[in-house]
A protein has these predicted regions:
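Charge-dense, helix-prone N-terminal extensions
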Residues: 1-117
Length: 117
């Protein structure tokens, strides 16, 4: 797979939109990021997963998935090696990140500023 495939599949998910974060393409649903191409020059896509989901993906396909280095990786942020991923694997991983973001969005309320009288 290539970054164009990552982009195509990410944008095929309902409500997904492309944005930019620190100069890199990101993919959002409900205004929140679920995946990025911040590491595309290194051959990776990035997925916003939970540590548990990350462990499952890495355990099943360690040649395709690896935690992002440092604290982000400990929080579940995961690289997917695009050259080693099949379309089905990439689509499944993006769908998992998208679904997780949708679930998190349901529990997120926007802060309201108090009315001044």
């Amino acid at each position: 797979m290539k970054p164009l495939d990552f982009r195509r599949i990410a944008l095929s998910l309902e409500g997904a939109e492309e944005g930019s974060h620190m100069g890199a393409a990101d993919f959002r649903v409900g205004g929140r990021i679920f995946a990025t191409l911040a590491s595309e020059k290194q051959g990776y896509g990035n997925l916003m997963l939970t540590p548990e989901l990350q462990a499952g993906f890495v355990g099943e396909l360690p040649d395709v998935f690896l935690p992002i280095h440092g604290g982000w990786g400990r929080m579940g942020m995961t690289h997917i090696r695009l050259a080693k991923a099949s379309e089905d694997v990439l689509a499944g991983a993006l769908r998992a990140a998208w679904k997780l973001r949708l679930e998190k969005n349901k529990g997120t309320k926007k802060k309201r500023t108090p009315k001044r009288g």
